[in-house]
UniProtKB/Swiss-Prot annotation:
Protein name: Maltooligosaccharide ABC transporter solute-binding lipoprotein
Binding residue positions for substrate: 52, 77, 83, 103-104, 148, 193, 196, 251-254, 274, 307
The protein's role, per its UniProt record: Part of an ABC transporter complex involved in the uptake of maltodextrins. Binds glycogen-derived linear maltooligosaccharides increasing in size from maltotriose to maltooctaose with the highest affinity for maltotriose. Has a very weak affinity for maltose. Has also a very low affinity for maltotetraitol, indicating that the binding is selective for maltooligosaccharides with an intact reducing end.
GO cellular component, one term: ATP-binding cassette (ABC) transporter complex, substrate-binding subunit-containing
Organism encoding this protein: Streptococcus pneumoniae (strain ATCC BAA-255 / R6)
A Pfam entry, by short name: SBP_bac_8
InterPro entries reported in the protein's UniProt record: Maltose/Cyclodextrin-bd (IPR006060), SBP (IPR006059), SBP_1_CS (IPR006061)
Location(s) in or outside the cell: Cell membrane
Topological type in the membrane: Lipid-anchor
Keyword Signal tagged: yes
Positions where lipid (N-palmitoyl cysteine) attaches: 25
Amino acid sequence: MSSKFMKSTAVLGTVTLASLLLVACGSKTADKPADSGSSEVKELTVYVDEGYKSYIEEVAKAYEKEAGVKVTLKTGDALGGLDKLSLDNQSGNVPDVMMAPYDRVGSLGSDGQLSEVKLSDGAKTDDTTKSLVTAANGKVYGAPAVIESLVMYYNKDLVKDAPKTFADLENLAKDSKYAFAGEDGKTTAFLADWTNFYYTYGLLAGNGAYVFGQNGKDAKDIGLANDGSIAGINYAKSWYEKWPKGMQDTEGAGNLIQTQFQEGKTAAIIDGPWKAQAFKDAKVNYGVATIPTLPNGKEYAAFGGGKAWVIPQAVKNLEASQKFVDFLVATEQQKVLYDKTNEIPANTEARSYAEGKNDELTTAVIKQFKNTQPLPNISQMSAVWDPAKNMLFDAVSGQKDAKTAANDAVTLIKETIKQKFGE
C-alpha cells in the first residue's frame, strides 16, 4: 500500500491538497439522479490506490461468480480522485465504488459529493468506525474498510521489553548511550513528532483535551485550551527540553526520528503502521506495541483513522453499488483484505481473524485502536490543523507559554471557522 494513502489522515490537515489532474477514473454515467434498480447491471467499476489491486482482483472474481456482475478495476491516485470528485460528479464520469480516508467521508458527504450508504449487519462495525463514517447531519456516507492507529515501535537490540509507561521512557532518557552527538545534555532515547498535531493529539486527549464536542461533530465546542490540553502541552515541552534542536523543525522532525531509529540511536518512537516497511527495509530488529500509559495513568488516546468504501453521488445505479459495498465489508472479503494488504479490517470478526495471525504490528494497532478517539470528519476540521501545529511549536519552543499558545490557537480556529463556514 502506498504510504501516501495510508498516512493521509496524518498529513491532510497540515497541507492544503491541490487539485490534481487525473485521467477519468470511472464508468461514464448520465447526468441524472442515481437509479434505484439493479436488475440490469452487468458491470461495476471500482477505483482504488494501486496497492489494493491484488485484493480487488481476487474479490472481484468471487463477486462475479456470486452476483453475475463483472467488476472492472481502475487504479490511480486515490486522493487525487477524491479532490476532483466534484467535477467528476458534474460530468457523470465517476466510478461506482471508491475508497476514502475517514476524515474525508463526512465532509464530502455533507458537501453532496457522496451517496448515503447503508451499513449492513454483515459489516460488523463498532462504535468508533461507525462514528468515522457518520457526518454531523447523522447520515452515513461510507462503509468502514480499514482501521489505523499510531503505535509504538521499539528496537529489540536496545531494550529487551516494550516500555509500558512514560516513566519507563523517562528512565531510558537518562541512559548516556542515547546522548545526541553535538548537543550536550540532549537525548534520542524516545522520540515523537509532537509538533505534528496528528501525532500529539493522543497525549492531549489522554489528559482530557478534545477537538470538537459531541464526539467530534460540534464545531462550536472546542476543547483544545482546557486544563487537559495545557497539561499535555507542558508534558510535551518537558521532552523537547531533552531532545535535540532539530526536533522543533516542523518539516524535518519526522525524517530525524526515522533516521535515528533506523541507525539504532533511538530505543522507541511513536508512529503509524505505514512506517513498518521502511524499518523492515532498513533491517531494524524492531518490535511493535501499544503506546505507553501516560503519567496520569490514562491511555494515549490517539486519533482513530483508516479508510472506508464510498459511493459517488452521480453513480448510475446506487443499489448495485450498495450491494457491492456490502460484499466488500463482509467478513470473508475483509479477511482477504488483510491477507493481501496486511491492513487491519474494520469488520470486527475479520479483525479477530487478523489478530489471530500473531503479527506484532497487527496486534498493536488493534489494541491501540480500542483507546482511540474518532478523527473528526466534519469540514470544520480543516480549520484546526495549522493553528494546532503553531500552538504546539510556539509552546515547545518557548515562544509562548502553553496556556497562551492554546488560547491563541482556539481563537484562530474559531475565527477561521466563522470566515469559512459562517458559524
